[in-house]
A protein has these predicted regions:
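A structural preference for short, hydrophobic beta-strand core positions in alpha/beta folds
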Residues: 1, 120, 312-316
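Short, ordered loop/turn segments at secondary-structure junctions
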Residues: 4-5, 64, 123, 284-286, ...
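Residue-level signal for inorganic ion chemistry
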Residues: 2, 40, 99, 118, ...
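ATP-dependent carboxylate-amine ligase
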Residues: 169-172, 184-194, 198-357
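Adenine nucleotide phosphate-binding catalytic loops in nucleotide-utilizing enzymes
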Residues: 74-82, 86, 96, 115-236
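Short beta-strand segments
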Residues: 3, 40, 60-62, 101, ...
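Flexible active-site lid/hinge loop adjacent to a nucleotide/diphosphate
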Residues: 9-120, 125-129, 163-167, 232, ...
Length: 357
């Protein structure tokens, strides 16, 4: 498997850093022990070198939303970004499938470019795209009461959300969508329901298994969540998910990627300002072309009309910002830490938790 965290083979990491490009994919395919591969396929690598493979059995597009990385590499609109992202859909084998989010119109439009079959997924079973696909007897995945349901014609299979720890009994909406996409992928590959069920039940998104992906910790009776979310869509998904988690007081630690557009940086704190009591801003280790303090100023601008936030602090340094947030926590509080240096920040958090025991 390749990802922005590295290359993993048989559960062991053989390379670190951003390995979501075609060179890493080719390295995996050339490995003598590999029979099947999963590739995170990033925009940048596709633009530079294309794909690291000819055809894929399954292509998965979870969402495009309002877009990310716009303004870079001459990609300025969501539609232009979609043209890049859909390359994996265009290169599905004729007997393969594309797993597409029926709730994202830009993703839905990719279906016409797929040489294989389409499996649509969406939380809302009444989604028009999903309903039409289901009425045609084609494969769909959706949520029905307390379960994820796979449907094809009159056939159905249910996966109780209570048996999928990733979703916290269905409370974390974006994790439900991730689980649906994973289930649809397994279904497309012909993997048995039993194997899919065991995989879902056994997967825990902790700092070791999925670093920086909604990692939850207990800190002296308060809840910490560490996540690498760094665009408005990700921030909104996190806010929606955390809304279902009880908390006495809510705080957030955030920086911004300097290579994003000004509006994209501002919009992140516009969202957070309506959901958190305290906001701690910090400057990324790498400013990505911005002057010192420029990103912090944009983040402050986004909080100008905050409906909930009452305390705003700007801290120099990610770890000092984390320590500042931890020092303020009381039992029953919740703190979202939007990390930049993923491995280092998670190690720092783990050390602080160990010290507090």
């Amino acid at each position: 498997m390749t990802s922005t965290d590295g290359i993993y083979i048989e559960g062991k990491r053989i390379d670190t850093g951003d390995c979501s490009g075609p060179r890493s994919a080719r390295n995996v395919l050339l490995h003598p022990d590999v029979d099947a591969a999963v590739f995170e396929t990033a925009r940048g690598g596709v633009l530079r070198e294309g794909l690291g493979f000819d055809l894929c059995d399954v292509a998965v597009i979870t969402n495009i939303g309002i877009g990310d990385h716009l303004g870079l590499n001459f990609i300025t609109t969501v539609d232009e970004l979609a043209v890049v992202k859909r390359v994996i859909v265009e290169n599905v084998a004729p007997e393969g499938s594309a797993v597409l989010n029926a709730a994202d119109p830009v993703v839905v439009a990719m279906a016409q470019h797929c040489p294989g079959q389409i499996i649509f997924f969406a939380r809302d079973r009444m989604n028009p795209v999903l309903a039409t696909h289901r009425a045609q007897g084609k494969r769909v995945v959706h949520v029905e009461r307390d379960a994820i349901v796979c449907g094809e014609g009159r056939k159905k299979h249910r996966f109780p959300l209570a048996n999928i720890p990733l979703t916290r009994n269905g409370a974390i909406g974006f994790q439900v969508e991730n689980a649906m996409a994973a289930i649809a992928t397994g279904w497309a590959l012909g993997i048995s329901w039993e194997v899919i069920e065991r995989a879902l039940a056994g997967f825990v998104n902790d700092a070791q298994t999925a670093p920086g992906r909604f990692n939850v910790f207990d800190y002296q009776g308060a809840t910490l969540i560490a996540d690498y979310g760094h665009n408005p869509d990700a921030i909104q998904a996190l806010v929606d998910g955390i809304a279902n988690m009880p908390a006495r007081r809510r705080s957030v630690v955030i920086s911004g990627a300097g290579d994003r557009r000004d509006d994209d940086i501002r919009q992140q704190t516009e969202i957070l300002g309506d959901a958190f009591d305290d906001v701690i801003l910090y400057q990324d280790a790498c400013q990505r072309g911005r002057a010192d303090g420029e990103v912090i100023a944009l983040l402050r601008d986004g909080l100008a009309n905050a409906r909930r936030t009452r305390q705003i602090d700007a801290i120099t340094g990610e770890f000092l910002a984390i320590d500042t947030a931890l020092a303020r926590l009381q039992p029953g509080d919740l703190c979202l830490i939007l990390i930049d240096q993923v491995e280092e920040a998670l190690a720092h958090i783990a050390a602080r938790i160990a010290e507090a025991r």
